[in-house]
């Protein structure tokens, strides 16, 4: 069982990225923090568009370099502090991960992310679930983003799986998650949210309204 992270293991939040960057930059660039924030947002948008259209990965440090912002420890601390409210693992997700572990089902994570592995592991450790995850792939560490098939194959390898037909992917994005997983032969479960665009060619094997519905679903398979 392989999960997306943002919007799946974490509840979906609508975020004002422009305001977030202003809050990050304000303590470190007095007098011109808005210009720095605008540059960071523009750089971030360019690299996310690259991920969407070319399936090429990027990192938060690439964003900062492109924006001309030095990644000091203090600035990174401000960035993580602003993001923290949006990173907490869904309590229903924690329960599902524990139930999967009890059933000896391998658990993986595959996330399109600009964050390094250590930041994600800090989040999972804080929420008490790091030891429940058998393997994880973060696009910041590889050349591709979802829905590129190699991203999904890398996630399978991370949990020691070699047969996609025995893997289930759970995600909130029809294009990145569902289409991508189905393209390599996985089953795919959609946990939709209203802010993510639909994609007609993405045909999930099931749609759930919450993670609490996942265990009864896979047991019916």
Which functions belong to the PLM regions below?
Residues 1-103, 116-118:
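N-terminal helical cap/lid subdomain that shapes the substrate entry/recognition surface
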Residues 1-3, 34, 94, 98-101, ...:
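Asp-based, Mg2+/Mn2+-dependent phosphohydrolase catalytic module
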